[in-house]
Amino acid sequence: VTPRTKIISLAMVTNVIGDVRPIKEICAFAHELGIFVVVDGAQSVPHMKVDVSYLDCDFLAFSAHKMLGPTGVGVLYGKKELLENLNPINLGGGMNESFDNPKEIYLKDLPYRLEAGTPNIAGVIGFGEAIKYLNNIGMDKIHEREMKLKDYLIDKMIKIPFIDIVNVECDSAIISFNVDDIFAQDVA
């Protein structure tokens, strides 16, 4: 972080080693310096309860396909006061309230002012159903079950002599490991 830093963008849970980052503390630190925080929730939102109010992040993004939903749909959460200050780069159908001439364009209220054209209606409906399904199970239960499965798998993998587990103690269900004499990307 330098005096020129305007945005900190980071994953809440890394997809490589599975560490859960202290987002609340990072946001507090950043906000003291006037820095915005953008959180990648792709590996956290589908697997644990995430409360944007508690975290105090400025933006959080995640995708439907990692939550049992369709591809091509996602969410960008943003604090309302920040979203209201965003102006679209391009304009499209459904964004403008009135269009008197090219120099006088009045945009609709959020979220419509930032969403041009016909949305992926089927995808959004499918994503909504996926979210309902996961919420009916309960994100705490999902996280608890994933952690039990992780512990079980680590218990089995640790007994295999040619496997080296990199992140035995991580707080997510992501397990990173190496197989002796095999390039990691080939294993993946």
Please state what every model-predicted region is.
Residues 1-188:
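Pyridoxal 5′-phosphate
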